[in-house]
Amino acid sequence: HGNPGVGYARARMENPDPERWLEPMRNAYISEIEYLDQHLGALFEGLKARGLYDTTAIVFVADHGEEFFDHKGWWHGQTLYEELLRVPLLIKLPQSVQGGTANENMARLIDLAPTMLHLAGLPAGSAMSGRPLCDASGAFTNADIAYSYAHNDFEGNLQQGVRSRDRALIQANEDNPRGVAPVELYDMVTDPAQQRNLAKLPERQDELTKLKEIINDFIRLIHENAPEPGATVEIDPNLQQQLEALGYL
């Protein structure tokens, strides 16, 4: 069709007209998911044909979600809303132990590498701050993770956020280009789409203060445990140009 795919459209349309593009963009995104699903099926069938599927651990996760005008914006990288942070995480253990079991506890990106290393019988690196989400028997080990921290520094948008099972706090710089409120507090039980900002309500100030303190604790721990910078290397000018075009430099 004539509509640009989600992965390539931003350079052409920074702010698409939602009345014209919302449904086509969502459909394009769904098509990409279906395309990926077909190839994952082929991968799994290949593992089964080679006798590897039953003894293999598989972790499926997305790097981020996408905005489809949920909060008056598009694409990704500019906010810490749920549509960007809450992504699928599927773990298939050897012999499909605990297959079909859902875990409603908190899971964080920093936990993925320790989980995969643990399943392989290897220790996590000293610089890793996460922890295994489960063990080889399929037993969940993340029941006591109470909070998940996220931060964003992209295109002038500086944000920190903390999420518990029932609350979400997002802080942003006052002059952020995206134009989001500097403080946002959401009840994730009654308002999972994050449409009612509770930050200014007098009865919410105590929990707001507590969540701000938790964000500060996370920031302090990150600085205290930050590894030493690695060696710098020169990169090819062509590679640098490609990385700049993708927004990584």
Regions found by a protein language model. Give the residues of each.
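Catalytic domains that recognize anionic headgroups
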Residues: 1-249
